[in-house]
Amino acid sequence: MSSMEERMELGVAAAPGSSSSGLGVGPVGGALDAGPGSAGLAGIQEESGVRRDGSVGEADPDAPPKKRVRLQEGEAGKLEERLYSVLCCTVCLDLPKASVYQCTNGHLMCAGCFIHLLADSRLKEEQATCPNCRCEISKSLCCRNLAVEKAVSELPSECSYCLKQFPRSGLDRHQTEECQDRVTQCKYKRIGCPWQGPFHELSAHEAECCHPSKTGMELMGILDEMDQSHRRELQLYNSIFSLLCFEKIGFTEVQFRPYRTDDFITRLYYETPRFTVLNQTWVLKARVNDSERNPNLSCKRTLAFQLILKSKVNSALECSFLLLKGPYEDIKIKPVIQHHVFSNDANETEYAPLPICDSVECNKLLAAKNINLRLFIFQIQK
C-alpha cells in the first residue's frame, strides 16, 4: 500500500461515517484537504499542542497569571519548610538561635543542646556522642558551622506584633525599635501612668494623658506604691547576693521535656532527666495550669514546677533554690527564691509557679520542643 493510501485510511479512521469522496487528495507531500469528518483530528492536534507543521505549540497566553504566581509562592514556601528541616538541630529539632556546632559527620546541634550533651556525659562519666551517628563529640572534635548560622539568620520569621515576615537576623531590632504595633509604655510611667499599648497610639495617648495635670498630693500616693515595689525588688537582689556568699552552691542547665499522662484523657506535663548537684540526684517536674482538665480552653496559661530529691540522705538537707533562663534562651523570667527542707520523708517541694511574665511567654514555652532553664541550689549550713 502506498503512502497516499495510508493517509487516506488514516483520515477515514479519524472520521468514521464519512465517505471517501469527502476527502480531496492534493499533490504528493501536500496536506490532506480536510472534509467535514476530519475536524475531530484537527481538534485533537490543537488540544495536544501539536501543530500541523510538527512544531510544539506554546502555552496558552490567556491562562490566568494569578495561578502561576500562586504556584511560585507555594514552591517558595515548600523550599523554606525544607530548609527548616535541613538546618534544624538534631537534638531539639528546632532552628538554632545562636551558634551552630557540627560533629565530624556534619550533623548539626544548637549551642544549648551541644553544651547539654557534654554536661550529661560528664554526669554519667561516659563519652558524649552525636545522637544521629553516635560518633564521639567534644569541644575539640566539633566545630562551628558559619554557613549554617548565616543561612538560618536569613530565613524568614514572623513578627509577634504585626505578623509580617522578616529575616531572623533583623527580627529583634524590628520588634524593639521599628514595629509600629510593638507594645510600649507612656513616658509618664514614672509618675504612675499604667498605660500600655501599640506604638502607633503612643502620641495620641500622651497628648491626652491626665497624669501630668495631677496635683502633688495625688502623685504622692502613686509614688509610695512605686517605692514599695522598688524596695521589694531591691530586697530580692540583696537576698540573692547573700545566697551567693554560701559555701555550698551548685547550678546546672536543666531541660524540661514534654510527656503525656496515661489517663483516659491525657494531660501534658514536663520532666527533666536526672541531674546531680551538690552530690545529690534531683529531678524537676512541671505542669500546666495546675493540671486542670482542659487547659486548652483557658486563655490564661501558667506553668508550675517542683524539685524532687531522688537520693537518700542521712539527715535533713535545707536548701534554697531558684530558676533562671538558660544561657541561649530569650525567656522573660523573674527570679523567685524558693526554700525547702529535704528529707527521706519529705523529698518533694510543693508546686511553685514558674515566674514568667504573662500568658504570652507561657505560650512561647509550650510551643518550644524543650524548655531550657538554669537551676541554682544553695545548701544552708547549720
From Swiss-Prot:
Protein name per UniProt: Zinc finger TRAF-type-containing protein 1
The keyword rRNA-binding appears for this protein: no
Zinc fingers classed as RING-type: ranges: 89-134
GO MF term set: zinc ion binding
Zn finger intervals (TRAF-type): 147-203
Gene: zftraf1
Keyword Signal: no
PANTHER family: CYSTEINE AND HISTIDINE-RICH PROTEIN 1, ZINC FINGER TRAF-TYPE-CONTAINING PROTEIN 1
Record family assignment: Belongs to the ZFTRAF1 family.
Lineage: Eukaryota, Metazoa, Chordata, Craniata, Vertebrata
